[in-house]
Regions:
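N-terminal helix-rich module
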Residues: 2-15, 33-59, 63, 71, ...
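Alpha-helical hydrophobic helix detector
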Residues: 20-37
Length: 225
C-alpha cells in the first residue's frame, strides 16, 4: 500500500503535456501582442529622436555662434544615394580671424524619417508654425521677421548676436550682414501624417521653437512643444 501511494503522488506532481502546450500557446499569444504593440511605439520614438536631434543641432549652432562671437551654418538635406539618411550639418563659417572653434559635424536622422511636408498639413498663414510659408515645402528658410520673402532656403546662419540670417558676413570679423532669415523645417515618416513635427527659427532673435501636429475637430492643428 505504501508503494502504491508513493507512485500515485509521483504521478500527480508536475504538468501534463496538454497543460504545457496550453501555457506555451498563451506565452506565444502574449509575445505576439507585445510585439505588435511595440511596433508603433518604436516608430514614434524614431520620429522623436529625429526631432530632438535636429532641434539640439540648431540650438548648439546658435550657442556656439554667441559664445565664440562668430557665425555657424546649419544645413538640412534629405537622403542622397547611396546614403539612406537625412542629415543636419553644423559648421563654422570659414574665413578671417574669427572662425569658429568647433569642427563640422553631420548628424544623421533615423532611416525612416526625413524632412517632409506631407499632404494634409495646415496651409493657411494663420495655421502654419509661426506663420512661415504654406506648409508645402519641407525645408523652408529664407523668410524675413514678418513672414515676407521667397523661402525655400536649406541653410541658415546663426550669428554672434544670436540672430538667424541668410548669409555670413564678408568682412572677416565673424559678423553677419543684417539680412534676418527665419523659417521652418518639417520632419515626418512618409505616409504617417500625425508623425509630423516642425521646428521654426525667428530671424531677428534666433529663437528656436518645436511643434507637433495633432488632430482636432475638422482637421489638424500645430501645437508648440
Amino acid at each position: 500500500m505504501r508503494s502504491l501511494n508513493k507512485n500515485a503522488r509521483h504521478q500527480a506532481s508536475g504538468f501534463s503535456l496538454i497543460e504545457m502546450v496550453i501555457v506555451l500557446a498563451i506565452i506565444m499569444v502574449a509575445a505576439s501582442i507585445s510585439f505588435m504593440s511595440a511596433g508603433p511605439v518604436m516608430k514614434q520614438q524614431r520620429v522623436t529622436n529625429a526631432y530632438t536631434t535636429t532641434l539640439a543641432a540648431m540650438r548648439l549652432a546658435r550657442g556656439y555662434a554667441v559664445a565664440q562671437r562668430t557665425s555657424y551654418s546649419v544645413a538640412f538635406a534629405n537622403a542622397v544615394s547611396p546614403s539612406p539618411y537625412a542629415t543636419v550639418t553644423v559648421a563654422p563659417v570659414v574665413g578671417g580671424l574669427f572662425q569658429g572653434e568647433r569642427n563640422t559635424v553631420t548628424y544623421q536622422l533615423p532611416q525612416d524619417v526625413s524632412f517632409l511636408a506631407q499632404s494634409g498639413l495646415p496651409t493657411a498663414s494663420t495655421a502654419v508654425p509661426d506663420g512661415y510659408g504654406s506648409g508645402a515645402t519641407a525645408i523652408d528658410f529664407g523668410w524675413t521677421q514678418n513672414g515676407i520673402g521667397t523661402g525655400g532656403q536649406s541653410t541658415i546662419y546663426f550669428c554672434p548676436d544670436g540672430s538667424s540670417q541668410r548669409a555670413p558676413g564678408t568682412n572677416n570679423d565673424g559678423s553677419c550682414p543684417g539680412t534676418w532669415d527665419g523659417g521652418v523645417v518639417y520632419l515626418a515618416r512618409a505616409g504617417d501624417l500625425l508623425s509630423s513635427r516642425a521646428i521654426t527659427v525667428m530671424g531677428v532673435t534666433g529663437r528656436i521653437r518645436g511643434w507637433r501636429l495633432y488632430a482636432n475637430t475638422g482637421g489638424y492643428q500645430w501645437q508648440r512643444q
